[in-house]
Amino acid sequence: MFLKDYKKTALILKDQKIDYTHLINQVNSFSTLLPNNNLSKVAIFSENRFEWVYAFYSVWMKKAVAVPIDFMSSAEDVSFILNDCKPEVIFYSNGTKEICEKAIAQLNHKIDKINLDEIKIEESKVNATFPEANPNETAVIIYTSGTTGSPKGVMLSYDNLLVNIEAVTTDVNVYKEEDKVMVLLPLHHIFPLMGTMVIPLSVGGTIVFSPSMASEDIMATLQHGITIIIGVPRLYNLIRKGIRDKINKSGIA
């Protein structure tokens, strides 16, 4: 439903390219790390990377609910989220390991940990398919930043996501199979999650990761032939500032 084998490149980061066949095989392999029984929710606490995508879709393959967490969250906020939604498993990275461990230490319930940087499994080449999801079932829980108090979880159903997909692929043909979409904003936000991952991959497009929000990384990523950039005013201000700072340092202006 959300991921098909389009026989083309699905993910790009610098000179690394992952095709849809490899993507689906990796998702299936990641799903084998998750328990078969008593799995309702899985948290993802990591910076943007290929493994973030594998982890996310592996949760859906298990018919569980994905809970993305801001990789810059404090241990207190992570602990609050984990205690609030009580996922059975959390994916994390070396970059978030310290915060993750501090957060888990504050919990009164058990949670299994999977480090994305330590996963060593043979790629599964089983012809795996995603199970049909009930449109009314919860697909993902998105937590607010907690700027006005503790983070609050928003439950979105598969139907919520499908309505968004259809709005920009069928009703208005914004996303097409030939598009290359830049992944720049953190994927724990619903806007980039849908706009730079779920929607482009659902139509067979290619998503291209920028290593950072630095202007030089963005410019290098654009060389891959980007056709869609998803951003917010603050992001564009950062890009503008980076460019102006470079110009000022060069003495051109």
Regions found by a protein language model. Give the residues of each.
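AMP-dependent adenylate-forming
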Residues: 1-18, 148
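Conserved AMP-binding A3 loop
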Residues: 19-21, 139-165
